[in-house]
């Protein structure tokens, strides 16, 4: 399928509406809940789905800002052509519903942690979204990002969580903003690593709060394992898009092409590490192999899709890799 086609295939509407990301986040959250034997409040599940959906919608709106829809892929073109409806109707409704869920259904401590993570997501969007306006957004965002980090340090959450989130925020500012505003710079920090990290932190936050309280360590083994999985998912997609001539300038193939060429080895190495975690789970897993087994199954499916990538378009590859994320969770939850 050409990148300039405007018709969205029936099987791709989930992606066009950005529903794949909240689905993946919620399913892996439920797997974590099963692994830790935690019964989540409905508001926590709905809240995660809503916030991930909102972030992805905003990201795609910003990516298409100031760009001719005919030059975008079908996913971003959909948002560019329906910008007003989405901006003035869909986004306010989603934000209002999310605020109601957050204020009425989520414990206060978790709400503050979510707010801290949301500020880091804003830094990420300022760093990597809005393709046509990244330079001036970098200048403005550097100061806004610093303010966000200072706000995180003042929130009523544990010092350990504060320091970890503030550290991630500072890293994102340095690698995301400051490297971009240098005119003519061709090497920055790829977005996949930070995007995968934020997605993993958001997915695991609710479980860690109920399992360990508001003093939870954000970068737990659960979060690190999911970080690796989600990052490899994003890098694989970027590699396929780059090979088709449709890659992003902030992706691994563009910034670190040497690493993109080693994707199969990266995937294999992390698969081996995860397999070891399944055989000999650390004490921090409490002897529960459920999460590493689900991650291992997903990695194996990713490897299978990668082998047949030459038969895929960038869009169909996205769909298949998202299925590689979804199917193991369904297996765990139904078994």
What are these regions (language model features)?
Residues 140-143, 250-262, 300-328:
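Interfacial loop-to-transmembrane junctions
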Residues 134-141, 186-197, 255-263:
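Cytoplasm-facing juxtamembrane segments at the starts of transmembrane helices
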Residues 5-11, 70-82, 99-106, 129-132, ...:
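Short juxtamembrane and helix-loop transition motifs at transmembrane-helix boundaries
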Residues 56-69, 122-133, 174-191, 234-246, ...:
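C-terminal ends of transmembrane helices
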Residues 56-92, 227-269:
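Solvent-exposed interhelical
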Residues 2-5, 9-55, 69-70, 88-124, ...:
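Hydrophobic alpha-helical transmembrane segments
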């Amino acid at each position: 399928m050409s990148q300039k086609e405007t018709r969205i295939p029936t099987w791709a509407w989930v992606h066009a509406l950005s529903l794949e990301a909240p689905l993946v986040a919620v399913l892996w959250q439920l797997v974590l809940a099963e692994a830790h034997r935690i019964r989540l409040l409905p508001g926590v599940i709905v809240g995660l789905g809503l916030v991930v959906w909102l972030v992805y919608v905003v990201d795609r709106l910003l990516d298409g800002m100031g760009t001719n829809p005919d030059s975008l892929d079908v996913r971003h073109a959909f948002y560019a052509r329906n910008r007003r409806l989405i901006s003035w109707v869909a986004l306010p409704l989603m934000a209002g519903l999310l605020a109601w869920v957050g204020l009425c259904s989520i414990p206060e401590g978790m709400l503050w942690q979510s707010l801290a993570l949301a500020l880091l997501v804003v830094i990420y969007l300022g760093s990597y979204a809005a393709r046509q306006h990244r330079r001036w957004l970098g200048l403005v965002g550097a100061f806004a990002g610093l303010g966000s980090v200072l706000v995180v340090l003042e929130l009523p959450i544990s010092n350990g969580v504060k320091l970890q989130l503030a550290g991630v925020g500072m890293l994102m500012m340095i690698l995301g903003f400051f490297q971009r505003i240098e005119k003519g710079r061709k090497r920055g920090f790829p977005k996949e690593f930070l995007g995968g990290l934020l997605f993993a932190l958001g997915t695991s936050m609710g479980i860690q709060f109920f399992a360990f309280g508001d003093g939870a360590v954000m970068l737990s083994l659960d979060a690190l394992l999911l970080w690796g999985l989600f990052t490899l998912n994003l890098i694989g997609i970027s590699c396929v898009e780059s090979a088709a001539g449709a890659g992003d300038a902030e992706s691994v193939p563009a910034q670190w092409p040497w690493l993109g060429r080693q994707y199969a080895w990266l995937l294999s190495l992390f698969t081996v590490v995860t397999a070891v975690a399944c055989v000999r789970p650390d004490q921090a897993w409490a002897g529960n192999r459920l999460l590493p087994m689900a991650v291992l199954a997903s990695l194996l499916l990713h490897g299978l899709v990668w082998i047949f990538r030459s038969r895929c378009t960038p869009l169909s590859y996205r769909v298949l890799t998202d299925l590689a994320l979804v199917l193991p969770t369904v297996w765990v939850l139904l078994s």
